[in-house]
Amino acid sequence: MKVLIPVSPINSLKTRLSEFLSSEERKNLLLNMLRDINKALEGLDVVIISRDEEILEFGKNELKAETIKEKYKGLNKAIKQAFEEIEDDEVIIIPADIPLIKKRHIEDILKLSKDYDVIIAPSRGGGTNLLYLKSKNLIEIKYEGFSFLKHLEEAKKKNLRYYIYDSFLISVDINTPEDLGEIFIHGDSTYTKNYLKGLGIEVESKHSSAGRFVVKRGGDNEVSNPM
C-alpha cells in the first residue's frame, strides 16, 4: 500500500490566506501541515507528487517519502500520473492541508480496508479529504468541486463495497484565516499549532450563544467565525 499526497506549487499556495500570512509564512504553514500528516502516517510508505522542487526536496530529505515530479497541471492528472508510476495497487490519497489527522484515523482505515473496496472521508465543504482504494483503478478520480459526492456515486455505480468515514478532524482542511481557529481548538501538540502560535496568531472565544470565535494576529488582523 502507498499513501499518496499531492502538493501544489509553493507560489500558488493558500491564496485565501494571503491577507493574513505572507508567502513565506504560507509556505512554512504547508511544511508544518505535512509534518503533522506524516506523523499520522508513521510506518506507511508515503509518496509525494508535486511540480515544486522545494516540496520534493522536503519530502525526500525530511519526511523520507518517495517523490514524483508532476508532469501535468491539475490534481486529477497528477494522481493519475502517480498511479501509473507506483507499483502498489492499494492506495490512500490524502491532501496536504489536513493537519488534524491522527494515527488512530489511519489505523481505523486499515482495519476497514479488510471489508471495503472504497473508503471516503468527506471535507466540510463537500470535497474528499481521504480516499482509500483497494485497487487504484477501481473508480475514476474526480477531485475538485463536490468530489465526495462524485466519488460516492462512482462507488455505487460500480457496485463496490464502500464506507463513509465521517471524521470532523479529517474534514478540517486549512484554506482561510477562519480555518486556523480549528487548529488552535483541536490541534494541541501539532507542528501546525506551534508554528501559528510562534507567529503571534491567537484565537479568542466571543462567548456568545452562537459559539463564535475570533482569529487575530498581534491586534492587527481579526477574523470572526461562527462555529
Curated annotation (Swiss-Prot):
Pfam families hit by this protein: CofC
What SUPFAM superfamilies does the database record attribute to this sequence? Nucleotide-diphospho-sugar transferases (SSF53448)
Q: Where are the annotated coiled coils located? A: none
Provide the GO biological process annotations: F420-0 metabolic process
Gene3D superfamilies associated with the record? Spore Coat Polysaccharide Biosynthesis Protein SpsA, Chain A
The entry lists its GO molecular-function terms as: GTP binding; phospholactate guanylyltransferase activity
EC number(s) reported in the record: 2.7.7.68
Which keywords fit this entry according to its UniProt record?
GTP-binding, Nucleotide-binding, Nucleotidyltransferase, Transferase
Give the record's pathway. Cofactor biosynthesis; coenzyme F420 biosynthesis
Q: Which family does it belong to?
A: Belongs to the CofC family.
Job description of the protein: Guanylyltransferase that catalyzes the activation of (2S)-2-phospholactate (2-PL) as (2S)-lactyl-2-diphospho-5'-guanosine, via the condensation of 2-PL with GTP. It is involved in the biosynthesis of coenzyme F420, a hydride carrier cofactor.
Protein name, as recorded: 2-phospho-L-lactate guanylyltransferase
Q: Please spell out the taxonomic lineage of the organism that makes this protein.
A: Archaea, Methanobacteriati, Methanobacteriota, Methanomada group, Methanococci
